[in-house]
Amino acid sequence: MTKVITRFAPSPTGMLHVGNIRVALLNWLYAKKHNGQFILRFDDTDLERSKQEYKDAIKDDLKFLNLHWDQTFNQLSRLSRYDEIKNLLLDKKRLYACYETPDELELKRKFQLSKGLPPMYDRASLNLTEEQTEKYIEQGRNPHYRFLVNHEPISWHDMIKGEIQYDGKALSDPIVIRADGSMTYMLCSVIDDIDYDITHIIRGEDHVSNTAIQIQMFEALNNTPTTFGHLSLIINKDEKISKRVGGFEITTLRKEIGIEAMAIASFFSLLGSSAQILPYKSMEKLINQFEISSFSKSPTIYQPKDLERLNHKLLISLDFDEVKDHLKEIDAEYIDENFWLSIRPNLQKLRDVKDWWEICHHTPNVESLNLDQEYLKQAAELLPQGAITKDSWSIWTKEITNITGRKGKELFLPLRLALTGRESGPEIADVLPLISREEIVKRLTSA
């Protein structure tokens, strides 16, 4: 049996977003499910936009998610190989030179659209005479090169969508070499997939038409096309996710919002499948449950709040032994097991544990806040008798309202400030049981 080899091929022109990472996850999981290999390739032939800082950030995000690669390379390191294939395809008459300027191509596109026609290249350059070609060269025009798509049916069995068919006549010949000599994604990708023995490619359904063309490229190079699977796109409020949608970058999720690696991995590896989205604690467990056949053909809706809820479920499921190393990573190694077990049900983000510790173990200095001391002392006297529980807050505030007439912010904010020293933070109903009765009274009467 052929060894399974998958790849993830980001362009280092920006940070990874949730759509990218879903593709990376599924390719990694598919490879590991079949005891195969996962290759990281950087499609960095766009010299103007590709940056080393993005390569470093992409690697950092993948490592954070435990998506370790077996091999990595950059397309820029393979330019001589691409030139070799370019010459081969020129000899086979599957590449041809074109001399239109970007402005001329844009005029053609607008004209076709004005006639209600799809914007397809008209193959005018195939009919250039030697004299016309020489004239363009004398004008200083550098040619770009297109791949000649055969006008015949193209079909393949997609791992997710099933049987797919295209008419080659409906596909425009793509530019594969720019006028400056740099290569575009289309042909380079096929050359790499052949040379690195890629067996399976899972990517977004916005690549389906590219796949149809690339199948002909495989065949033009006398190779059997790899097996493809096309995922439905992730959408948020009827828009597909892209690099330019703020708030959906992986670095934002992990560094600014504080989502755990396994919450991200669990969520996006199950999103769009028939499997229930659960907070898995390890990549091994995700591998065991992974089935590419479970993914739907329908668009996949991403709601950020769903990811945050899954993050909460993951945190409350973690025993102290499972989280103590993570606590060290956020400089919270002082958290002990008893405190973790007490505070765990209230956590939305792991970093919140530091706020809870500070609130529960340090009497806040609120002298500068000029709080209404008479009101706070009255509130202390109305504190319910007996053990402090989560129900104590609602009982207490109802009694305060009955006696003082205070409601809303006028009631809540002075109590929060006196008890925590902060205008916002964890729910006071959750904080109270973690502070002794004596400490609550002390904070209220000394404010």
UniProtKB/Swiss-Prot annotation:
Subcellular location as annotated: Cytoplasm
One Gene Ontology term, aspect cellular component: cytoplasm
Motif ('HIGH' region): 10-20
EC number per UniProt: 6.1.1.17
Reactions accelerated catalytically: tRNA(Glu) + L-glutamate + ATP = L-glutamyl-tRNA(Glu) + AMP + diphosphate
Pfam families to which the protein is assigned, alphabetical: Anticodon_2, tRNA-synt_1c
PROSITE patterns: AA_TRNA_LIGASE_I (PS00178)
Family: Belongs to the class-I aminoacyl-tRNA synthetase family. Glutamate--tRNA ligase type 1 subfamily.
Subunit (UniProt): Monomer.
GO molecular function, one term: glutamate-tRNA ligase activity
Any one biological process term the GO annotation gives: glutamyl-tRNA aminoacylation
Motif 'KMSKS' region boundaries: 240-244
Designated name of the protein: Glutamate--tRNA ligase 1
Organism, scientific name: Rickettsia akari (strain Hartford)
Biological function: Catalyzes the attachment of glutamate to tRNA(Glu) in a two-step reaction: glutamate is first activated by ATP to form Glu-AMP and then transferred to the acceptor end of tRNA(Glu).
Binding of ATP, residues: 243
Keyword Metal-binding assigned: no
